[in-house]
Every structure is written in structure tokens, then in C-alpha cells.
């Protein structure tokens, strides 16, 4: 009736959100700081491999995890250290929400693969809980919370392509003139991010060499111009030598990708996933097929970038007393 207030929205029975994996097109690692962290300059690109998180009201916080497309989730924690669960709890605490949720994660991104799957879980959990509890905090506020959970969480929320500085949490969007096509080769085991950074520090101390000069301008120019050859030439990762020292098979994986026709290959982040740049999505599919005899189909993923950041896929309302949802 005219003048009546809008009815209260129905309570939500569940919310499902997803967030993308990332590849580092550039990763410059500064000297180790007194607090143990390193100043980074990186170019993130979100890619079309996703983590999907569903949150439902519960009496207490809990989490379950399943793998999608052959992703091994055996190493994913199911306790209070899980990033998605930590994200839900942190948002409830900061927003003054006195309700708990059960978090269910469907993982497509390799675990401990240098593609920020755990950070994507946290980003999706923040977006899902924000929707479930009708907080409407906005991405910037969620990203500020996300930075407390991990350096890659803010990028998981924003997605696309961005330059990251600090520990990677300060983001500036980068315009891209074309999409990128990738083949990701999964390793048979994971690599510890702290161990890779420590090996990078050790190698620099042993050789007396500091961080090499960066290629940020070259990467940005290649992205703006949509030039796949220039992008391939500009790909750079200061952690690659350290990752290859800890897992010598990685160098062979990069070389195999180049021999099979990849424009370029790079260890993704701290590894051990190897990212192979292709000329097009069709070329990426052919490259993956050519690499199957070497690595097996279960260790190969194709994807494109840039992909959007975390977003809600589905919000299910609680049925009304009359039976309608």
C-alpha cells in the first residue's frame, strides 16, 4: 500500500561466491626487511581457474573442502588456520555479527602451487559472508580486512590485472589490450612459500648479488599493446631460481613447454606451478594436448586472463512460512 515501508528482505539460507587464481607476470623481490617480509613489486593477472565458497548459517564455525577437476585437497587445513574460515570469523568479529557459518570450499586451483588458491578462498568467503549477513561493506573495505589475512587476498577480491606493491596488497589496476591464454603445469608436490623466499635470500647472500633490475615498464607496455611476444619476453620472477633450486624438475618443465611451442614459461609466484604463455586459447589447448604425454592430463590446466575478482554466484533465500522462497 502507498506509503508503507518496504518489507524486510528474506533471510538467506546460503550464499555461494567465487574468486580467481592468479599468475604473477612480474615478481620483483626486495631485500629481506627487519620484520621478515620483503618489499615486492608484482604484476598480478587473475585467470579463469576459480575457488568456489558456499556459506550457510550454523551454530558454530566449521569448514569442509572438496577438490574439483582432480585437484588434490589432502594438504588443505580443516581447522582454524584455514584462510576461508579465518576470513569468515574476522568479518564477523569486525562487523559485530554474532552468528556463525559453515564454510564449504570447492577447490579448482592447485594447492600450494603459487597461484593464491588459499587467498582466493578467503576473498570468496569475505564476499559470501558480506552478502549472507547483508553488510554491504564494499570491495575496498573487504580488501582492507583481507590484507590482514594475506598479501594476495586483496587482489583476489579485485581481480583483473594490477600492479601490487608493499607485500603485494597495495594495488593499481593495469589496462590490458588483449586477453592472455595460459597452460598451467601442476607439480607433483607443493613448495613452501617461506622456504622459497629463504632460499632466495640465501642465494643472494652467497653471491653478493642484490635484486636484479625490474621489467615493470616492459610488462605494462606489452599488456597495454596486447603484444604477446613482448609480454613473453618481459615475464620475470625473482623467485624462479630459488624455486628451481628446491625443485629442480621445474626448469625442465619450463624448457619442455618452450619446446612444445609456448611463447614463454615462468614459475608462478613461489611455485611450483609453471605458467606457459600461449598465443591464443586455441593454441593453449593444442599446447596442453602436446604436453599430455609428458605430464598427464591431470597435471595440466588451461585458462585465460584477465578474469574478474570475487563475486556472488548464488544467494538462496530461506523459504517463507507459506512455503514460497
UniProtKB/Swiss-Prot annotation:
TM annotation in the entry: none
The encoding gene: ispE
Organism whose genome encodes this protein: Kineococcus radiotolerans (strain ATCC BAA-149 / DSM 14245 / SRS30216)
Pathway the protein takes part in: Isoprenoid biosynthesis; isopentenyl diphosphate biosynthesis via DXP pathway; isopentenyl diphosphate from 1-deoxy-D-xylulose 5-phosphate: step 3/6
Origin superkingdom: Bacteria
Catalytic activity: 4-CDP-2-C-methyl-D-erythritol + ATP = 4-CDP-2-C-methyl-D-erythritol 2-phosphate + ADP + H(+)
Full protein name: 4-diphosphocytidyl-2-C-methyl-D-erythritol kinase
Key words of the record: ATP-binding, Isoprene biosynthesis, Kinase, Nucleotide-binding, Transferase
Annotated EC: 2.7.1.148
Amino acid at each position: 500500500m502507498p506509503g508503507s515501508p518496504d518489507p524486510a528482505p528474506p533471510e538467506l539460507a546460503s550464499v555461494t561466491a567465487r574468486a580467481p587464481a592468479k599468475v604473477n607476470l612480474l615478481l620483483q623481490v626486495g631485500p629481506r626487511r627487519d620484520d621478515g617480509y620483503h618489499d615486492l613489486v608484482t604484476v598480478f593477472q587473475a585467470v579463469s581457474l576459480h575457488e568456489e565458497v558456499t556459506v550457510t548459517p550454523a551454530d558454530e564455525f566449521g569448514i569442509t573442502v572438496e577438490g574439483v577437476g582432480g585437484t588434490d585437497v589432502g594438504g588443505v587445513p580443516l581447522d582454524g588456520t584455514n584462510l576461508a574460515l579465518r576470513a569468515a570469523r574476522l568479518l564477523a568479529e569486525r562487523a559485530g555479527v554474532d552468528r556463525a557459518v559453515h564454510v564449504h570450499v570447492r577447490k579448482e586451483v592447485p594447492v600450494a602451487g603459487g597461484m593464491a588458491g588459499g587467498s582466493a578462498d578467503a576473498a570468496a568467503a569475505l564476499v559470501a559472508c558480506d552478502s549472507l549477513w547483508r553488510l554491504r561493506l564494499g570491495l575496498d573495505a573487504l580488501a582492507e580486512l583481507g590484507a590482514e589475512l594475506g598479501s594476495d587476498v586483496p587482489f583476489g577480491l579485485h581481480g583483473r590485472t594490477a600492479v601490487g606493491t608493499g607485500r603485494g596488497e597495495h594495488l593499481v589496476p593495469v589496462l590490458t589490450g588483449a586477453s592472455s591464454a595460459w597452460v598451467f603445469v601442476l607439480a607433483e608436490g607443493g613448495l613452501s612459500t617461506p622456504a622459497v623466499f629463504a632460499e632466495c635470500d640465501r642465494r643472494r647472500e652467497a653471491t653478493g648479488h642484490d635484486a636484479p633490475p625490474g621489467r615493470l615498464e616492459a610488462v605494462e607496455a606489452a599488456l597495454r599493446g596486447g603484444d604477446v611476444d613482448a609480454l613473453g619476453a618481459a615475464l620475470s620472477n625473482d623467485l624462479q631460481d630459488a624455486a628451481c633450486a628446491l625443485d629442480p624438475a621445474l626448469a625442465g618443465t619450463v624448457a619442455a613447454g618452450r619446446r612444445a611451442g609456448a611463447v614463454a614459461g615462468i614459475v608462478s609466484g613461489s611455485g611450483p606451478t609453471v605458467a606457459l604463455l600461449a598465443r591464443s586459447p586455441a593454441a593453449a589447448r593444442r599446447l596442453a594436448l602436446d604436453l599430455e604425454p609428458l605430464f598427464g592430463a591431470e597435471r595440466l590446466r588451461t585458462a585465460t586472463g584477465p578474469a574478474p575478482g570475487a563475486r556472488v554466484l548464488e544467494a538462496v533465500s530461506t523459504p517463507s512460512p507459506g512455503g514460497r522462497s
